[in-house]
Structures are given as structure tokens and as C-alpha cells.
Amino acid sequence: MLLRFFKELYRAAAPAPVTLGTVPFGRQLPVLITHDVDFERSLTNALAYAEFEASVGVRATYFTQVKYVRDFNDVAFFNSNAPPVLQRLRALGHELASHTVSHSKVFARFPLGTGTERYPDYQPFVRTPILTIGGSVLGEMRVSKFLLEQFGGQEVVSFRPGHLQNPYSLPQALMATGYRHSSSVTANDSLTHLPFQLNYDRARTAETPIFEFPVTIEDEAQPPLGQRVQAALDVARELARYGGLMNVLIHPDITGHKLQFERDFVTALKPVAWFGTVNEFATWWAARNEVAADVEYSANFAAVTLTAPRPLNGLALQLPSDWRVQSVQPAGLKLTPSEAGLVIEQVPPSVRLIFRR
């Protein structure tokens, strides 16, 4: 809220306010459809969701538990049936992501581990809801990533812990094991609907390159998800006021009302929202985060210079409504008008835009 307040203050008071949009291609809000595959029947059910998503041009993220140990929680469902499902998800354009090995309710209290954990020697065992034996943070991350990449044929760069258990060592553990993005907390707990950068040990002294993408709505609260379509759309409408992130978590343990919720929700927002995977949005956000903007102005003209160290598509610039483009460098750069300004379709390393005020 404080950052949004300062942004609005800047836009109201600055003589030449220019800000970067928070949604690719100037859409009203970004929507991430994410699934936690952590139950015996969820693997098969995931395909029903995936086929629907592909049919409407939506790519989703499937956070998949690699459960190869039978224990208190469930049978060992990551077996010979899993690889064909993973490969079909990948073929449909979806992202494969890690949801740990054990899905332990006490993952936040696991020791960090050695960084040498590997399959099949790593054998975490959930004995009760509050007791897991043989688990470590690095083991959960290393082994799940290895198996998903081995059988899914896709690099795994996004992570979500079971039960959103969030150990203090998670940011540096993500770095150490090759992940780039996290979706491990709710928006309510983190008090923001925007991505944010994680700090070492979740403290204040050192940033990591990992960004967190908090969960907005999940399917385990009451009333049942199928009865919450309008409530979810109401949240989306509020987030669209400032380009906040809508990260929807749906467990594919059943289809029924959950799948119908997704159908109705996606259909309603498709005309105004940007949909993509966690990796797609996170890659875009990290590139946007490094863009530098410099504004010069006179009585009748303004010049905006952008420096973009990383490849970036669909960057929206929010500009005063009376500005009109006079010239562009490099020549031929494709600009598209948007509701709040304009969109640069493909951002080169350096851009200079001249406007008449």
C-alpha cells in the first residue's frame, strides 16, 4: 500500500511522470493459473485441467510432488504412471514445477541439509502430521527438481512447498539448487498482491535474485471453489485497478466444481487479463525490474530514455494523457497505444522516445 501511495503521489505531483506497467502488454492484470499436484488421483485429473487450458490458449503451472515413498500422507504415486502425464503437460505448453518430495506439514522446520542429497538414497518419511524423518530443505528441492526434469523433459525453475511451509533458509536454498522463482506464501500473509524480491534468511541485510509470486486465491477455504466465481472476479477487478497479480491455486484432486470454476473464471477474464505460467511472468518481471528510465522535459517536449539489460517484450509505459510521440530511436520500434500510455512490443537494450507535451 505504501509503495502504491508513493507511486500515485509521484504521478499526481511530478511535472513529467513516467512509470513502468506491472502487466505484460498493458493488459489490466496478470493471471497465473497454478495447480498443486499432491494426491494420488491428482496426476490423472491434472490432464482434464491441462486440456481445457490448452483449448483456450492458457498456459498453467503444475507444481508436482514427486512422492516415491509410501507413508502417512499417501501412497507412492510418483511411479510409472507419472512420466506420460508430465510429458503430456509439457506437450500442451504448461510449466512443470516442484512441489517437494514429502509434502510435509513441518517442512519449515527441516534442517537445511548437506546439498548432496540424491535419489534414491533420499528417503523422507512422514510418520505423523507433525513428524517427518530424514527430510531436509535441500533434499526436498534437489531431488524433486532432478526427477521432474528427468521424466518431464523440461527445466524446472519454479518451486512451491507443500502447505506453503516457508523455512527461513528457503531463499538461499532456492539459489543453491537452481530455482529462479518461488510461490510459497499468500498475498494476505505477505501484505501485497505484487511480486517481491526475497532476502537471504528472509531477513533485511542481503537480497537474492529470487522473486516471490504470492498466492491470491486457493481452493481449500470455504465455501467450495465452485461457489466463489463472483468473489474471485471481484478480487480480480480490484487488482486490475493497479495491475496487481492474480495467482490462483487449484488442487486437481477432483474435477467437478473446481474445473467449472476455472472455466468460468478464465472465460470472464480472458478479454482483459494476461495469462501465463509462473516462469513466463517471473522472467518478464525480473527483466522489467532491471529497466532504468530517465526523463528529461521542457515546456513543450519530453524525452524518455530506457535501458533494458535483459530481453523484454510487452513493456507498458504509463504516461501523461496529453503526451504524443514525436520520434523514436531506434527507428522502426513498434509501439502500441494502451489505456494508460503505450506498449513497447520488443524492448531493445536502449530506447529513446521523444514526446510533445
Summary of predicted features, one role per range:
Residues 175-204, 212-222, 275-285:
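His/Asp/Glu-enriched short active-site or ligand-binding loop at hydrolase and phosphoryl-transfer sites
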Residues 38-44:
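Short acidic, Gly/Ser-rich segments with clustered Asp/Glu that frequently serve as metal-coordination loops
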Residues 1-32:
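N-terminal pre-catalytic segment of deacetylase/amide-hydrolase enzymes
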Residues 150, 210-281:
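Catalytic grooves of carbohydrate-active enzymes
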Residues 307-324:
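Surface-exposed beta-strand/loop patches in extracellular or lumenal glycoproteins
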Residues 30, 43, 50-169, 185-193, ...:
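Metal-dependent polysaccharide deacetylase catalytic core of the NodB/CE4 family, i.e.
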Residues 313, 338-357:
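C-terminal beta-strand-rich structural cap/linker in extracellular carbohydrate-active enzymes
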